[in-house]
Amino acid sequence: MAAPGEALTSSGYIAHHLSNLSLYKLGLVGSETSFWNVHIDSLFFSWFTGLIFLGIFYKVAKRTTAGVPGKLQCAVEMIVEFVADNVKDTFHGRNPLIAPLALTIFCWVFLMNVMDLVPIDFLPYPAEHWLGIPYLKVVPSADVNITMAMALGVFALMIYYSIKVKGLGGFAKELALHPFNHPLMIPFNLLIEVVSLLAKPLSLGMRLFGNMFAGEVVFILCAAMLPWYLQWMGSLPWAIFHILVITIQAFVFMMLTIVYLSMAHEDPDH
């Protein structure tokens, strides 16, 4: 590690910071590819950021006044209006749950992404040397397990609302008779539609993971090339640019969720 007294090489430093605190690393499961190899740090920081989101909005909701709002209330109201406008413009069905879901996704993903702005060794170094925690990754959205879990949650909602709105027969008809409405084309239609359907959660989760993982690697490379007390010099320019990236990625995840759920509510005959 780049901190004083640490013997890790640059490659060792990078590998160390790309390793999750998992049950396998703690010797609690026998294989790193085991289904039960839970990434403890990713789960902790995803719950942590989720609680921050709930705490902020609960505080604002409890203290909302009809008079002059405070700065925090103004910020929250701007976010709520921003999300509500996007839902109104994009979602063409009727479902009162879509706007709260979109708001939760945007804020939660944004807060998880913001963890990428925490200096590389700010939490892992004291965790290792003071608490004995050997590995610690603080960016949940740079863990493919987290992003794909969220994407699969969206996928489950897509299937649920497709069947609820269109009926099981209508959903099957949509898969079998689109884009070519002819019985002989059913196998071809099914191939296209099933691949397209499965590609939605895959692209949704992997897009967020890929962008955030790449950003994390850049921060780690900047830190690996400099001593610990100069790491901020290499990371600051990228951090300023990365503020835009983390916001855009949260927005894209939210918008694609709205679009996919809007498609699930559409009548296939129109």
UniProtKB/Swiss-Prot annotation:
A GO biological-process term: proton motive force-driven plasma membrane ATP synthesis
Cellular compartment(s): Cell inner membrane
GO cellular component: plasma membrane; proton-transporting ATP synthase complex
Superkingdom: Bacteria
Main location class: membrane
Cross-referenced InterPro entries: ATP_syn_F0_a_bact/chloroplast (IPR045082), ATP_synth_F0_asu (IPR000568), ATP_synth_F0_asu_AS (IPR023011), F0_ATP_A_sf (IPR035908)
The keyword rRNA processing appears for this protein: no
Keyword Transcription regulation applies: no
SUPFAM superfamilies: F1F0 ATP synthase subunit A
Residue ranges of the TM segments: 38-58, 98-118, 143-163, 208-228, 239-259
Recorded GO MF terms: proton-transporting ATP synthase activity, rotational mechanism
Keywords assigned: ATP synthesis, Cell inner membrane, Cell membrane, CF(0), Hydrogen ion transport, Ion transport, Membrane, Transmembrane, Transmembrane helix, Transport
Role: Key component of the proton channel; it plays a direct role in the translocation of protons across the membrane.
PANTHER family assigned: ATP SYNTHASE SUBUNIT A, CHLOROPLASTIC
Family to which the UniProt record says this protein belongs: Belongs to the ATPase A chain family.
Name of the protein this chain belongs to: ATP synthase subunit a
